[in-house]
Amino acid sequence: MLKVENLSTSYKLIDGDVHVLNDLNFEIHDNEIFGIAGESGCGKTTLLKTLYDIIEFPLEIDKGKVILSGEKNGQSFSYESGNIQKTWWNNISYVPQAAQSVLNPIVRLKKQFLDSIPQEDRKNETKEQTLARVAKYLEELNLSPDILESYPFQLSGGMRQRVIIALATFMSPNVVLADEPTTALDVVV
């Protein structure tokens, strides 16, 4: 479950604070789909970055907290913003609206997939076994495993976005935060 309690954020600018989120409260339960809609600039991306704990100057949390709790691999966990541990990111993933902000353009995709998998989740696999699991997952998403040999700059915008979605969902996180995930994707007719 992802729980937000009295969350307020603002951008600290020279000419004053710009408040973005004000006393936000909600809960997202396991297996629940939760959508956020609003006009451009209303704070949707700021909220997602705050939930993923990407707090970068000049953005600050003024008050409130984010709590992530659940179970993964048979073990319970609970984390609170401000006390984030590395394992927070093993349980939550983020799909940005711009794939180029996540993918390293000069590193092959197979290395980027391998680097995104925590060592403890490799289950004593060899690199080849892990890549075989990745290839099988890509096939389930109708992506060719051959794409692993590619560099992101060689792919179209839509293909990069599909790779980001695959990266974000491969480890079956408890929560997937998606910021306009269909950006650059083709409409299927």
In which residue ranges do the predicted regions lie?
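Conserved ABC ATPase signature
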Residues: 151-155, 159
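The feature captures the beta-strand-to-loop junction immediately N-terminal to the Walker
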Residues: 37-39
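Conserved ABC ATPase "signature" region
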Residues: 126-146, 174
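Catalytic Walker B motif of ABC-type/P-loop ATPase nucleotide-binding domains
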Residues: 176-179
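ABC ATPase NBD coupling module
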Residues: 72-93, 111, 119
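Conserved signature/switch motifs of ABC ATPase nucleotide-binding domains
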Residues: 171, 189
